Amino acid sequence: MFNYKKFLADVSHEPGVYRMYDDKDQVIYVGKAKDLKKRLSSYFRKNLSSKKTEALVASIHHIDTMLTSSETEALLLEHNFIKLYQPRYNVLLRDDKSYPFILLTKERHPRITSYRGSKKFAGEYFGPYPHAGAVRETLSLLQKLFPVRQCENSVYSNRSRPCLQYQIGRCSAPCVQGYVSDEEYNQQVELARLFLQGKDQLVLDYLIGKMEQASRNLDFEQAARYRDQIQAVRSVIEKQFVSNERLDDMDIMSIAYQHGLACVQVMFIRQGKVLGNRSYFPKVPANTDLSELTETFVGQFYLQGHQGRSIPNSIIVDRQLAEKSELEQLLTDQAGRKVTIQESVKGDKSKYLQLAQVNAKAALNVQLKQSSRMSERYQALCDLLNLPEIKRMECFDISHTMGNQTVASCVVFNQEGPLKSDYRRFNIEGITGGDDYAAMEQALQKRYERDLEEDKIPDIIFIDGGKGQLNRALNVFQHLQVKWDKNRPHLIGVAKGVDRRAGQEVLIISKQEREIHLPDDSLALHLIQHIRDESHNHAISGHRKKRQKAFTQSGLETIEGVGAKRRQALLKYLGGLQGVKKATLDEIASVPGISLKLAETIFETLKND
């Protein structure tokens, strides 16, 4: 039993962070305090504030502390530790993806494109957008309104005539001389920039002025083009919510909670425009106070490595926060400008908050129904296989084109559904092209020839294939030399049936040495189809990326001595990949940074491709 009195005797009254551990030396809770001694003493009073705290204290084996120079520093360290340890008694944001932006590049002929990651390229970034779909929708809209290129530089640099986008009026073809002047092109770029900044009226005023000027000059064809563009922009503006207020950059958050499940709805507003909304379902320990949930979510959302999320000027929440001022100060320090958290708003901000609340409740209801269906399907599969419980399932699939660029996928499901953070892909090498058996064997070896923690050992492993694939998998497990219990997983083959149609799958159960044909309406079959389809899609997407990479590689990547800078110089000075391939030895040697010896290597390599 934890001797808290002895522990507290050595704790100081300084600010800092504390980590609580269980008897397995796992971090079960991370917290911070302005006064560590006072805060930690509160856990060991007779009357605790909640059942959650009671359960936490009962699990404590030992505690360690780390002093910080300020409470703000402690708050930041707390969120970093939560991300690192994922303690079961903390609220956990289960979303680790970076957010997409729209990038307007800084070039002679700028392009508009989607971008995800650190802002390392020169240009202007607009966003973040809640998901890739919102970016694609905005890019499609911009293409219809402003004929600014969206193509990659490798395409732009190697055009000899305009592409289809020019033919359908969605690009002005700056790639080919004589179609649009730099001045005309940059006018459209500026209009796109203003539109992304939410300055719609400036866009309209400019276009109306240009239309009237063209009419005065009797250039009625040009005036008609401006008229059509004005109508298109007005049509878009009319569909958007028009606020009487000048809204700042802000995120609006609302929380709905029911039956142990929480939904945080975040609405993103930038430059006065609603970029979209997104639902988050953080892992919430039982009996967690919703104000604590809001506070923890805000901290994790903006502070845990940022994940490409820009911190807005204002964050609107629908709960009172106990540590609002500390959180504001930390976000202000991170953003390098004043950031406020608002708990009470009026006007259009209040309308947006109400909208976020409605969306949070609706998304929570959908999630609850999905969770209920998932639970029913899990129980049906348990009954089918005579298993008391299934905590973790993994499924493998193989994808290739004519035996090339072979990729294996492994997807993971727990009792809540897909566990995407544990998904994996494996590049398959050194086998005969098209040998799916060998590919499956290599994938299983890569996955399981290593130490696995107890909670990472799957109860079921699905193999997408018939008896041949399953037998190869059984052979792999027979020869595994590992410390974990390799006999625990049930290996099950999922064959597609005689007609290879959905609903006619045959399950081949290795441990029971039997085949099962399930009816179309079987809940167990629906779960198996779900995980099998996830694995199939994951394998295909990985294969497509690998195939595209192989297709777009210049051939220079494999040449020793040709790094990124030299490759870029070759493509730039010789007019792209085709120019490099057609170049003579002397022309290659004339490129800055390319010696005669290296030029000979490049010339011979490309000639023999």
Curated annotation (Swiss-Prot):
Q: Where in the cell is it found?
A: Cytoplasm
Matching entries from InterPro entries are given as:
GIY-YIG_endonuc, GIY-YIG_endonuc_sf, GIY-YIG_UvrC_Cho, Hlx-hairpin-Hlx_DNA-bd_motif, RuvA_2-like, UVR_dom, UVR_dom_sf, UvrABC_protein_C
Instruction: Please give the Gene3D superfamilies that the UniProt record associates with this protein.
Output: 5' to 3' exonuclease, C-terminal subdomain (1.10.150.20), GIY-YIG endonuclease (3.40.1440.10), UVR domain (4.10.860.10), UvrC, RNAse H endonuclease domain (3.30.420.340)
Q: Which GO terms describe its molecular function?
A: DNA binding; excinuclease ABC activity
- SMART domains reported for this sequence: GIYc, HhH1
**Gene Ontology biological-process annotations:** nucleotide-excision repair; SOS response
Hey, which family's this protein in? Belongs to the UvrC family.
What's this protein's function?
The UvrABC repair system catalyzes the recognition and processing of DNA lesions. UvrC both incises the 5' and 3' sides of the lesion. The N-terminal half is responsible for the 3' incision and the C-terminal half is responsible for the 5' incision.
This protein's name: UvrABC system protein C
